[in-house]
Amino acid sequence: MIWNNRLILALSLLLRLHLAISPSYIHPDEHFQGPEYALGNLFDWAHETTWEFRGDSPIRSFVPLWILYTAPLSVLNFLWKGQLSPREAYWFIRAGHALAYWILGDMALDRLSDSKKSKTKTLYLVGCSYVTWSYQSHTFSNSTETLLVLWCLVIIKESQQRHSMHHQRVHKFMDAGLLGLLIVIGTWNRVTFPLWLIVPGLTYLRKYLIHNISSLILLIASVALTAFFVIHVDSVHYDLEWTITPLNSFLYNSQGHNLAEHGIHNRLTHLVSNLPVLLGPLLILLRTPSQYWKSLQFQSAISGVFFLSLFPHQEARFLMPAVPLLISCYDINAVPRRFTSAIFLLSYVFNIIMGFLMGTLHQGGVVPAQHYLSKHVDSGSHTVVYWRTYKPPSWLLGIPEGELEILDKDHPLGTNLFKRVTDEIENIQIRHKKTMVTVLDLMGSSPEYVNDVIAALAPINPLLVAPVAGLKELDLPAYKEVWKTRFHLGLDHIDGLESLEPGLVVLEVL
């Protein structure tokens, strides 16, 4: 049994390494809420500034992006003598996210564990989770949120231990100051961050802070000073007065019609769908014996899941912090011993399938296609049409700012773009003659509409990026295949088994 566990752990480490650098594309937010904006601005690459960063009330803070992307990539670019490519930047930030979670996440879980047995169980099962292999290595703000939640809990736990052991006052002050700093960074990273700390925070206040007024005052001061600094930086960055992005985000998300644009879900979605999808068959081990009810991990998980379930927009990635927290509360003895091996085998199969699906296949051709196109379009004018793919991250093309025009549903043409995009054909041809690149995102368009657009653009030989499964629905003029990968699967247009054929191609219309 020990040998089997060690073998499985070794295989999970290999999967961690492989999926950390596999270019799957789980959700557009992993690009457009972080690298697209931060690195596009840093390197003056053409990029799309999404609505979160525009207007008089931006809802995304620049400070977490500066910490995660701008600062480290500036150093890397210096070491590369100013020759850093988008491809190298992409692999660096993906590997950085993976390593940060492997090192800092495991360290936090180690320090949160009450015994060697509990630590071994937690690190083993977290290491065997596909969420660790795939989601956590992607550039989601949720990935950062997970680490910040874990380390806030570490500080809370160790503060209470130091109080009972009468440690030096300087350690208590350092704990309070650092906790305040992390709370602000976490909140400005994601407005939902405090929800994970409400229940454990109340316990911390009742058992510790109420008896240590000096630490409470320092915690409040740390929060206030850090918040003031972040607000000042954001205000300067956006050239606005008193830009409080978490407040803007809260006000935006408190409006039902705004949430409706992103999708309205049943308030039980997190509980009955998202948690089982993230945790898999081992969710049955969450029997919650009395000792787990008292743990900070369980309190934090319940706090986050409960309060997030009050909001009608619910996506599985919102619960990423709950995965290591709840795994640490698993009770191996929750099921009869004769069923244990079967449940664990089922869990391994589940995580391998989900890991391969979300970590390798899911929209897995988009990023490699961008890497290919970055070399193909740097020598002249091109028009690239994307169909039935997630929104392509423009920064990966490495095109200088001002030389790329992006046409999609968020373009100033608005919905008219999808109604009569052919009205723009003449303008696209003009840009083509000026040695510019035009990206036309037709993700949700019908095959008939795509046929019309390609036919109108045929004189300038556009490139079409589309899934292999969708080509059968198109009636294209003569073309040649210039690039292809089999590691791509879109799950947004499933219509029978034929639509599940994997693959993404780049075609040049002749």
Swiss-Prot record:
EC primary class: transferase
Membrane topology designation: Multi-pass membrane protein
EC number(s) on file: 2.4.1.-
Function: Alpha-1,2-mannosyltransferase involved in glycosylphosphatidylinositol-anchor biosynthesis. Transfers a fourth mannose to trimannosyl-GPIs during GPI precursor assembly. The presence of a fourth mannose in GPI is essential in fungi.
Keyword terms: Endoplasmic reticulum, Glycoprotein, Glycosyltransferase, GPI-anchor biosynthesis, Membrane, Transferase, Transmembrane, Transmembrane helix
InterPro entries: GPI_mannosylTrfase (IPR005599)
Pathways involved: Glycolipid biosynthesis; glycosylphosphatidylinositol-anchor biosynthesis
Protein name: GPI mannosyltransferase 4
Superkingdom in the source lineage: Eukaryota
PANTHER family: GLYCOSYLTRANSFERASE (PTHR22760), GPI MANNOSYLTRANSFERASE 4 (PTHR22760:SF3)
Glycosylated residues (UniProt): 142, 212
MF terms in GO: alpha-1,2-mannosyltransferase activity
GO biological process: GPI anchor biosynthetic process
One cellular-component annotation, GO: endoplasmic reticulum membrane
Principal subcellular localisation of the protein: endoplasmic reticulum
Segments traversing the membrane: 7-27, 62-82, 89-109, 179-199, 213-233, 268-288, 339-359
Family under the similarity heading: Belongs to the glycosyltransferase 22 family. PIGZ subfamily.
Lineage of origin: Eukaryota, Fungi, Dikarya, Ascomycota, Saccharomycotina
